[in-house]
Amino acid sequence: MYRFFENFYDWWKNIDKFILFLILFLFFLGLFFSLVSTSLIASDKLDTNSYYFFLKHLIFIGLGVLILFFLSILKEDILIKISLAFFLITLVFLLMVPFIGIEVKGSKRWLDLGILPRFQPIELLKPYFIVFVSILLCQNKNIFYKYLLSGIVLLPIILLLISQPDLGQTILITMVWLTLIFVSGINLYLFFLFFIFTISTSTYLIFFVSKFEYIKIRLISFFNSSSGNNYQADRASDAISGGGFFGRGIGEGTLNSKVPEAHTDYIISVISEEF
């Protein structure tokens, strides 16, 4: 027992306390909003336990805290090996999506392996992608090869995401890669070229690839509010403005019954209206 407290003291002494408290604060803030803003959605719209989303989030946050603590006590070399192994495993999961993935609302992004809860492989892959690319950028001294190798790692992930289709995650993982190479000290001119290429490719996909036509329609509707296709966005905007500075109060919001995905896509609007 003494050895345990000694190890815990060493861990506490070396941990970045500001980041730890910031993470825990965001965890508990998310739990609070999940409790007060999704109970009516769960009971009225999904006809299930009022605390369904809260308990679901509580379980995953508990697992997240345990994993966070476990990984933080590992030595760096062991952490790197674990990250590389899980990067390959999650990449295999992502490769499985086109073949056995579950299609939801026109996009095939989810896996259901039976023994595990349904999940999106890209959500599991992202943290390991960050570690893997960071290793390539830090350990490879040849400037050309380290950026080339990191780009080669990124390319199959992007192609798999585009095939789902999931442009949002494609842009997100690309921006993560751009951030990593920027922090690594890349030449600003080269970084600017990569950035322009990313913007140009995203624009092409949105306006000229039929898979992403729904995004083009959303953009056109957003900039042309008179088209009448902005019902959900307009309701969300009305909810935010209707809440005012102090909000309507817990459980007094009206957006829950006006949009189909109030507990996910429009949760910020739900919170803004009530608080």
Identify what each model region corresponds to.
Residues 84-91, 145-162, 167-207:
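Hydrophobic alpha-helical segments of polytopic membrane proteins
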Residues 75, 129, 133, 163, ...:
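Helical mechanochemical/support elements of P-loop NTPase systems and associated helical scaffolds
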Residues 37, 127, 173-175, 254:
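Short hydrophobic alpha-helical segments that form membrane-spanning helices or hydrophobic packing faces
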Residues 73-84, 113-116, 141-142, 188, ...:
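Membrane interface segments of multi-pass transport proteins and intramembrane proteases
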Residues 2-21, 25-26, 32-164, 230:
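Membrane-helix boundary/helix-loop-helix interface segments in multi-pass membrane proteins
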Residues 104, 108-110, 193-275:
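Hydrophobic, glycine- and aromatic-enriched re-entrant/interface helices and adjoining loop segments
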Residues 140, 144, 163, 185-186, ...:
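Short coil/turn helix-boundary motifs
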